[in-house]
Structure formats: structure tokens, C-alpha cells
Amino acid sequence: LLSSSFTVFAEELPHGNVGAAQVEQLLEVDVVNGTERIINLPEMAAYSMIADTASSDVALGRSIIGGSDERTKITNTTSSPYYGIAYLSITMEDGKTYRGTGFMISPNTMLTAGHCLKSSTSQAKSVTVYPGRNGTSKPITAKMTKYYVDTKYTGSEADWDYGIMVLDSNVGNTTGWFGLHGTSGSSIGTTNVKVTGYPADLDGYYMWTCGGTVSNITTNRFQHTADTAGGESGSPTYFYNGSYGNQAVGIHTHGGNYS
């Protein structure tokens, strides 16, 4: 069975705050001022809390379930919830460039996969964010000013493969953002999820989505059966939760062959 792994949030936080129960310290990197520091989560304002190796334009690994590709293209990328999902153009300190996906969780805060921001040999120097990108159409643009990765993440630890990005403008007031839904024991509140992002194998400048079911839930991760590809690292895994709207239950980090 091919499926992908996700970071699972610690508790239900319908207003878009990340639960602190599983995280002790974060590495803060200010890409504008070139500074770094270790911080404890309580030091951060809630709305600022907001990460495949970061998938390059040529790394087109696929995870297709059952031999049939069920991904569908999103044509109206400025409708909800799609406008809150962004194409990421990533430049690392070693000069290499990558692509990825991220999603808004507040006016100026975004989640992505940790490996989109940090590897074992380098880390992000700059990230340009294109919410709702649709081919050459880029309806809104922002730049990353700071990012946070867990201090336990050094480039390969799947349990801590998440990242938080702070942007230079409140683009979320235009795009909208996802609420966050956490776990309760072995349940994440749903058995069906969607994964929406920018897969590189289908011309990665367009947004695609696929539904799937969840399984193998652990404290920090779970697997799903949605079809994905390189470039979708950092995509939201989410479901529609009635009056709470679209809530993310995880961050897509990688695909693999699970049997």
C-alpha cells in the first residue's frame, strides 16, 4: 500500500493555534536580520505560531494508490479553501532552489514541511509564497521573514518534520486560512481527508487535490491513501468540519510503500 506520512497536532484548536503539548523548543531563524535563537513556545504569540527532501523541479516521486491516479485539478484557486494553499519557491543557503507547498493558519502565518526549510546540510535563505497560484497567474505574493523548526529536527526525523513560516504581510486576510484539528487518543476526528498542493509531476505550477482515508495513527504521525507527488510536501491534509469549516489534521511530508 502506498501512502504518506503526516505530523499530527496534539489537541483540537479550532481557532488556528498550534498545540504546544508535544513541542518544547523551536529554532527561530530570522532571514531578514540573519539571526538565530532557541525559544520556548510560551514566548510566542498564538497567531504567530505557526516544514520527500524539499522537492525540486526534477524530483517527481509519486505515491499513486491502486494504480489509478485520482487527483483532480483545481481551476478556481482563489475560492475557499484553496486560496489559503500556496506554492513555495525556496532558495537554500547553499544556493540550491526547491519547490514545495504551504498553507495559511493565520493572517501572516503558514505551515509547511520541516524539510522544505531545513536539511542536514543547509537551511532556507529565502522563501517566496504564492497563495492560489494557477500556472502563470499569481494573484498574491508574500515573502518569508522568519521560520521555526523543532530543535529535535535536523533534516530527517519524521516525527518532527514540520515548519512554521512568518510572512511579511497579512495575506491571510485576503486568502483565508485553515483551522487546526488535533487528536484524541487514536482518533483524529475523521477517517476521510483531502490533500491539496502543487505536485511537480503534473506541471507543478498548478494546484491539484485528492481524497483518501487515514490509518496507522500514532502520537505524531498517520498514513493516508491520497495520491501525491514530489512538490506536495507541506500540503494540508484536511477535512470539512461543519461550523468550524475546513480544518487541517496534518502536514503532508512524504510518500512511501507501506504494506
What are these regions (language model features)?
Residues 1-10:
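Sec-dependent N-terminal signal peptides of Gram-positive bacterial secreted proteins and lipoproteins
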Residues 10-101:
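Protease-domain processing segments flanking chymotrypsin-fold serine proteases, especially trypsin-like
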Residues 61-83, 89-95, 99, 118, ...:
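Conserved catalytic-core segment of clan PA serine endopeptidases
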Residues 105-106, 218:
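Residue-level recognition of beta-strand termini and adjacent short loop/turns
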Residues 108, 112:
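Cytochrome P450 catalytic-core helices
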Residues 116-118, 133-137, 168-173, 199-201, ...:
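Acidic glycine-/aspartate-rich tracts in secreted/extracellular proteins
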Residues 135, 158-228:
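Chymotrypsin/trypsin-fold serine protease catalytic domain
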Residues 227-252:
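Catalytic nucleophile loop of clan PA
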